[in-house]
Amino acid sequence: MTEREEFLDIFHRYVTRPGSEKLLDWLDTKTDFFTAPASTRFHGAYDGGLCAHSLNVYRVLRSSFFEPDTDTEETYAIVALLHDLCKANFYKKGTRNVKNDETGKWEKVSSYSVEDMFPYGHGEKSVFLIERFMKLKVEEAVAIRWHMGGFDDAVRGGSFAMSGAFEKYPLAVKLHISDLEATYLMETR
């Protein structure tokens, strides 16, 4: 099973709320989500890296934190698979020059650059894009909004809202931890 097929299988199996099929159709036909990288030069910086990263976050979140008595499969699938939706149609493929240490000559290599057509932030942009098609529960929206934790620009700018979000919504902490584990412990840089 390809990563795209696995993503679609999990999504179809667990995400059933109104609008989910329209969201998935948009994701599949109007974005590069399944072929986009997860970053420009670090984790998942390859074609399909975004989908692979989303699946890794899902695996960590599901295996480390899921409590069948209190959690729902749908919520876990939504927040993990869609937390980085903001990165769809976000990167542009190109080339850059790199000096070959052996020959001393400059060579063109494939690269990615950011081309943000809708500069709306990171987590908040993912929430906005999802809610164009389907409603999120408050805990889902908060978890996706703050999944970057201390790396979020608002936190670096001095906002204390993340602390309140983490105290009130444990799912936000769990998603952040899962994202960190997937990024720094599972994925090659």
Residues covered by each model-derived region:
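All-alpha helical catalytic cores of prenyl diphosphate-utilizing isoprenoid enzymes
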Residues: 23-30, 43-55
